[in-house]
Regions:
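Extended amphipathic, helix-rich lipid-handling scaffolds
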Residues: 1-228, 239-247, 251-354, 384-417, ...
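C-terminal structural cap/anchor segments
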Residues: 345-373
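Outer-membrane beta-barrel and related beta-rich outer-membrane complex signature
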Residues: 373-382
Length: 482
């Protein structure tokens, strides 16, 4: 059966309610739909201006290719199979306009794509089940989306006549299985991030304009997320993260973020953070961080960043971390050397700078709170730290049992991980020179990455980190395979 009123290129075959129909290619608003064919069982009610087709079971439309090419990151769907068993299609073949403006759909659909490609996605099959309503140029699609990796999400898509597209996605991610599905769906998942437990409710909205412009926003509500990133273990991460993309600038908000513990080798506990970030997508270090609240517990004391707006890169003062009453005794306990002892409380201020080369500290300062305390440093360890300088023997002797009233140090840290301490210590050793007052000026250096590696290998973080560090060292040839 041929309908003369239908645009050129259409052919319809009707036999006992069966229709085989080659559909024309559609090009509109950056979208391209090619290689489509309908094989349906239906009832047709036609008039001089339109036809209404009600599809029965086994009705399908196969599409070789659906693409959106007006973006720098194009979207491609291949080998789509759409089940129209419960859909009504209205063809206004007597109306003017494009086919996308003359075709309307309503009903329940099932869609399967053998492969979806996008720079942000791992290429794989996807399936969708939901409802469609509207003309193709102004279509609303709502339902459930599932990736071959197992990621499940609620999807809401609105197409507009000018070619714009609005997409809303919501997903609940639970435990290892949910995280594994997420990692196997998105290309940007960090290779060294492992999540063991917790949950996240994620939502995202994307709008692609007719001219190819992209606006995106999203949020994530985290609940007790625990895992390992690179060599650092974390536990109890909760809170809300907001993000939006506007004119190549990233805007992020962190609301009531809490972390029970972050442990790279020396644990930081009870972290609390609320703030906002704004910066260019191309170089996040050129952005600004507005801190509303930032505090944590560390070595029985506290760390705090004062509220304010800070430039991440190029700021002369860096981001100031205030250190309050950390325990020297606890610090000596976590240091990977036997025989270190100390007492007293340390406070000060450490400005942290960021660059493409890493983290730096310039002229940080720590000092002991009155009335001071006691230091005992083993001679062998101290001599090694001082480089075996025999001229420093008096320092080594004094620090075997030193009662200090003043302990102050500048702190510098470079991009390569070298920590430099310029210490000034005033006090006495009751067993040295009759307990005469002694003033010591000591310069110490420490390789912090090597120190943390030692702590991680000792099992002070957790077994997963120890195994990861050992594997990395073996791969780099720094540690022999046992």
């Amino acid at each position: 059966l041929t309908w003369p009123a239908v645009a050129a290129g259409w052919s319809l075959a009707v036999e006992q309610g069966k229709i085989g129909m080659a559909l024309p290619d559609i090009h509109t608003g950056g979208w391209a739909v090619t290689g489509s064919r309908a094989d349906v069982v239906s009832s047709v009610n036609a008039s001089g201006e339109s036809a209404v087709i009600r599809f029965n079971p086994t009705s399908t439309v196969a599409t070789e290719r659906l693409a959106y090419t007006d973006l720098e990151q194009p979207l491609l769907l291949q080998d789509l199979r759409t089940n129209l068993s419960h859909v009504t299609l209205t063809l206004d073949y007597g109306a003017s306009g494009t086919w996308a403006e003359r075709l309307a759909m309503e009903g329940e659909v099932k869609i399967e794509a053998s492969r979806i490609e996008h720079p942000l996605l791992v290429p794989q099959a996807w399936s969708f089940q939901g409802r469609v309503k509207g003309r193709l140029a102004n279509l609303r699609v709502q339902g459930s989306l599932v990736s071959a990796a197992g990621l499940k999400a609620s999807l809401d898509v609105q197409l507009y006549p000018d070619g714009a597209v609005a997409i809303s996605v919501d997903s609940a991610i639970e435990g290892q299985a949910g995280i594994r599905a997420l990692a196997e769906t998105f290309t940007g998942w960090p290779e060294l991030l492992t999540v063991d437990s917790g949950s996240a409710a994620v939502s995202a909205e994307v709008r692609m304009g007719p001219g190819g412009g992209l606006e995106a926003s999203g949020s994530s509500n985290l609940e007790k997320v625990t895992g390992v990133f690179n060599r650092t273990a974390f536990s109890g991460l909760s809170g809300r993260v907001l993000a939006s993309l506007e004119d190549d600038r990233l805007i992020a908000g962190f609301r009531d973020l809490t972390v029970e513990q972050v442990n790279p080798g020396i644990p930081v506990n009870a972290i609390r953070f609320t703030g906002d970030y704004t910066g260019p997508v191309a170089n996040t270090l050129e952005g600004q961080l507005e801190v509303q609240q930032a505090r944590a517990q560390f070595l029985e004391g506290a760390l705090r960043i004062p509220p304010g707006v800070y430039d991440l890169e190029g700021s002369s003062g860096g981001i100031p971390v205030e250190v309050q009453d950390i325990s020297l005794d606890r610090l000596m306990e976590v240091y990977p050397a036997e025989g270190l002892e100390g007492s007293g409380l340390l406070s000060g201020r450490i400005p942290i700078g960021f660059s493409g080369d890493g983290i730096q500290v310039a002229q940080g300062r720590l000092s002991a709170e009155a009335p001071g305390g006691r230091l005992r440093l083993p001679a062998e360890k101290l001599q090694a730290m001082l480089g075996g300088n025999q001229a420093m023997d008096v320092v080594v002797q004094a620090l075997q049992n030193f009662h200090y009233s003043v302990l102050a140090s500048t702190i510098d840290y470079d991009e390569k991980g070298k920590l430099t301490l310029d210490l000034r210590i005033e006090g006495k050793n009751p067993e040295l020179r009759g307990g005469q007052p002694v003033v010591l000026n000591v310069n110490l250096e420490e390789d912090i990455p090597a120190l943390l590696t030692s702590l991680q290998l000792s099992g002070r973080v957790n077994e997963a980190v120890t195994k990861r560090v050992r594997k990395l060292l073996q791969e780099s040839g720094e540690e022999a395979v046992p």
